[in-house]
Amino acid sequence: MDYRFGRQYRLLKTDDFSSVFAFRNRRSRDLLQVSRSNGNGLDHPRIGLVVGKKTAKRANERNYMKRVIRDWFRLNKNRLPPQDFVVRVHRKFDRSTAKQARAELAQLMFGNPATGCRKQA
């Protein structure tokens, strides 16, 4: 198992983010929203993160949320389809609610329609 999180697994350019948002394939829960593309032409998934200052004012809070999401992706990337994903944090979470954020991320990323995720056009 490869648990690294190298550059090839990240969305780095604005065009990469724009192409994912252009598909308008979004699902959201209480804390997170995940946009996904139909495919990226690669043999592995890639992820981009959006945590705005409106969500968390302090940089260390934003960094913690990104760290939790990156860690979940790093451990589960082998189970994901080769698509591009953009995860946007809607509401701030901390150590006490990180478990809920990980559970929501699993529901959103694996796209199980029985999980009650709200699909947005």
From Swiss-Prot:
A Gene Ontology cellular component where this protein is annotated is: ribonuclease P complex
Q: Which reaction does it catalyse?
A: Endonucleolytic cleavage of RNA, removing 5'-extranucleotides from tRNA precursor
The record ties this protein, via SUPFAM superfamilies, to: Ribosomal protein S5 domain 2-like
- A single GO BP: tRNA 5'-leader removal
Give the EC number. 3.1.26.5
Tell me the organism.
Neisseria meningitidis serogroup C / serotype 2a (strain ATCC 700532 / DSM 15464 / FAM18)
The encoding gene: rnpA
Functional description taken from the UniProt entry: RNaseP catalyzes the removal of the 5'-leader sequence from pre-tRNA to produce the mature 5'-terminus. It can also cleave other RNA substrates such as 4.5S RNA. The protein component plays an auxiliary but essential role in vivo by binding to the 5'-leader sequence and broadening the substrate specificity of the ribozyme.
Q: Which PROSITE patterns match?
A: RIBONUCLEASE_P
Assembly behavior: Consists of a catalytic RNA component (M1 or rnpB) and a protein subunit.
GO terms (molecular function) for this protein are:
3'-tRNA processing endoribonuclease activity; ribonuclease P activity; tRNA binding
Enzyme class at the top of the EC tree: hydrolase
Which UniProt keywords are given for this protein, alphabetically ordered?
Answer: Endonuclease, Hydrolase, Nuclease, RNA-binding, tRNA processing
HAMAP family registered for this protein in UniProt:
RNase_P
Question: Which family, according to the similarity comment?
Answer: Belongs to the RnpA family.
Name under which the protein is recorded:
Ribonuclease P protein component
Q: Which NCBIfam families match?
A: rnpA
